[in-house]
Amino acid sequence: MNGFILSVSEWILFLSTFIVVLQPLCAMFGPTIPIAIFLTRFNAKTKIFNILYLIYYYLLFTFIYRVIIDEELFLLYKLGLTFIAVNILKYNILLNLGIWNIFLETITDNPPMNIDKKYFEGHKLFEDVDNFKKIRSEVLDIVDNYDIKSLKELSTIFRNAVEEKNDGKHTWRFQFLKQNGKLCEILDNYPTLKNALEDKLIFNTGISILDPKISIPQHIGYFKGFLRYQICIETNDDDPNKPYIICGEQKYTWKTGEGVLFDDMFNHYVVNNSESRRIVLYLDINRLNLPNIIIKINNLICDIYSKDKLSNYILQKQHVQRKNK
């Protein structure tokens, strides 16, 4: 198998193998070799990197095609190389969702912040005054009784995702309650939360805790097929330095008991200059502001991702709930 295009394809295939294998390993165990450190510094969800993914997929398909038609290769060898290439293609889609992100970005048109909540009717259950009191009580019980780790401790992917103080106490912490459409065991003791999170539109949920004087640098999300809903569980509403988020150059200031729907695929960052912690309930919602056929495809992609053994194994390794002693 000779030729410039094929040689490039082979190199892309080899490099993508490193990406597929090392990306989850980095997430679980931390970078142990230079290439792992190199790879985790990339945000594979930016528009520029998505364009590179399109080029990569073109080269990968070229490789598969050339392998199949090459008369010099044994059939078994052809099948083996094709199987490897197709699986690399599969896991890159499942882990990075790059091509689908590009497509959704071309057909969606919504503001960064304060998206109409009609696209998530479930917000009413969270924002109902009486129900919110119960939800808030259960969330704070989890915060007080579980050892909720910094995102930096959960995964090396987040090691640059928060500005920490050096006292070991002030950071950005996160506790999953629902992952890949599946409720976590922790909810067995919290019936109000469990009932609210059984909504099939909710794909991921967690408790996000931003300690006093902590900020989250600029970043974007990973999947355009979601909208992000947050309801504020705790903040000091009387503090003039209340925490806020800037998303797509639009500012939103959290208020206890108030929910907001936004698109985290816009560049955004969070600032907490107050002396109080900010706690929000964080939900990834399957996007509904799409044509019906696209909604069905998007839901199918989410369903495939939720059943993927590799991604579920990684999440289990990253987010283990430990109760305080």
Which role does the model predict for each range below?
Residues 216-219, 245, 262, 268-274:
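Short beta-strand His + acidic residue motifs that chelate non-heme Fe in jelly-roll/DSBH
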Residues 233-256:
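A short beta-strand-loop-beta hairpin characteristic of the jelly-roll/cupin
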Residues 253-267:
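Conserved metal-binding segment of the jelly-roll/cupin
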Residues 3, 7-10, 14, 73-78, ...:
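Non-heme Fe(II)/2-oxoglutarate
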Residues 194-212, 225:
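A short glycine-rich, His/Asp/Glu-containing loop-to-beta-strand
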Residues 209-211, 222-239:
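Short, conserved beta-strand element in jelly-roll/cupin
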Residues 1-97:
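Intrinsically disordered, low-complexity, charge-biased terminal/linker regions in eukaryotic proteins
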Residues 228-235, 261, 275-292:
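A short hydrophobic beta-strand segment most commonly corresponding to one strand
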